[in-house]
C-alpha cells in the first residue's frame, strides 16, 4: 500500500477515535443522549469502513487473495499471519457491528454500544500495529 495513503487512512481512524473519546468525556453519559450516541456510532462506523479499506488495499498490494466480503479481508490477513486469530475474529465481529449500525440502526442499544466502547475500541489500534509489524511504514528506500 502506498505509504501516503496508509498514513492518511491511519490518521482518519485516529481522528474518529479521538472524536469518540471526546464524546465520552463530555461529563454526562453520552449513551443516554441520542445526539451524542449518534456521534459515537457514526465515528465507529467510519473507523470500521476505513479499517476495511486498509485491509482490502493491503491484501491487494501484497497479492494475498481476493476477498469476497469485508469479513473475508480480515480472515485473509489472519491466514497470512498478519493478524492473530483473536484479533481477526474481533475485526470480523466489528464488520458485523458496522452492518447493524448501517442497516438496522434501531438495534444498536446503549448497552451494546457501551460494550463495544469498553471492550473493542482499541481493536483499531491493534489492527494498525499488526499491519505495521508485518509491513513497516514507511517502506525502505530502494
Segments predicted by a language model, with ranges:
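Solvent-exposed interaction patches of small proteins and small membrane subunits
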Residues: 1-142
Amino acid at each position: 500500500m502506498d505509504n501516503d495513503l496508509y498514513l492518511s487512512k491511519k490518521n482518519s481512524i485516529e481522528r474518529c477515535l479521538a472524536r469518540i473519546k471526546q464524546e465520552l468525556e463530555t461529563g454526562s453519559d453520552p449513551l443516554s443522549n441520542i445526539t451524542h450516541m449518534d456521534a459515537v456510532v457514526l465515528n465507529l462506523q467510519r473507523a470500521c469502513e476505513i479499517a476495511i479499506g486498509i485491509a482490502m488495499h493491503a491484501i491487494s498490494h501484497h497479492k494475498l487473495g481476493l476477498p469476497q466480503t469485508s469479513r473475508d479481508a480480515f480472515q485473509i490477513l489472519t491466514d497470512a499471519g498478519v493478524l492473530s486469530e483473536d484479533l481477526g475474529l474481533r475485526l470480523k465481529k466489528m464488520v458485523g457491528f458496522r452492518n447493524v449500525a448501517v442497516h438496522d440502526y434501531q438495534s444498536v442499544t446503549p448497552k451494546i454500544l457501551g460494550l463495544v466502547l469498553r471492550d473493542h475500541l482499541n481493536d483499531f489500534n491493534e489492527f494498525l500495529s499488526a499491519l505495521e509489524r508485518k509491513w513497516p511504514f514507511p517502506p525502505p528506500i530502494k
